[in-house]
Amino acid sequence: MENVFIYRYTVLGSKKISNLIFAIFIFLGSIFFLKASIFSFLDLKTNSLNGNIVFFPQGLVMGFYSLLGLLFTFYSLLTFFLKIGFGYNEFNKKENVIRIFRWGFPGKNRRIEACYSINDIKSIKISSNTGPKNISISLKGDIDIPFIREGFSDSFSNIEEQAIDIASFLGIPLVYNQ
């Protein structure tokens, strides 16, 4: 990595196939709940599991849950297709800059970009507290900027490997924060 001046990798954000599959399952469950709610309201009997559901309160609650599920499905599909959180982390030795870029929701601030000088970086920090593990850039002045979380990568070992690669590329220390 001595002759390489730019180290760049993409961050998937919400554009993962597991999010799409999860949204499809929530959609199917919501449709089943909506069907059960409508059939209980119209007092129709079916051969499925909802044979004896009274509209008030069970059918009404199932209708409410189905609407919540459909809204959640819409939100999940919207974040998937708009690539919310998708972006890249770029470490550029030639320009002496670290660039963190992500896509946000449509609007005035859809493009989220943060640039920092490599000279301002004190260390790369791996936090492994009880919550989700993450990598952050520790700037001079005790400012930590997280840029990779455990949920956005495959596993914690991949996060550690990326942190080691970044620290060795930049020539700065790697710190484990327990």
UniProtKB/Swiss-Prot annotation:
Chief location of this protein within or outside the cell: plastid
Cleaved signal peptide residues: none
Membrane topology: Multi-pass membrane protein
InterPro entries hit by this protein: PSI_Ycf4_assembly
4Fe-4S is among the record's keywords: no
Residue stretches spanning the membrane: 21-41, 61-81
Keyword ATP-binding: no
Keywords: Chloroplast, Membrane, Photosynthesis, Plastid, Thylakoid, Transmembrane, Transmembrane helix
Location of the protein in the cell: Plastid, Chloroplast thylakoid membrane
Gene Ontology terms: biological process: photosynthesis
GO cellular component: chloroplast thylakoid membrane; photosystem I
Cross-referenced Pfam families: Ycf4
Function: Seems to be required for the assembly of the photosystem I complex.
Protein name listed in UniProt: Photosystem I assembly protein Ycf4
Protein's organism: Bigelowiella natans
Lineage: Eukaryota, Sar, Rhizaria, Cercozoa, Chlorarachniophyceae
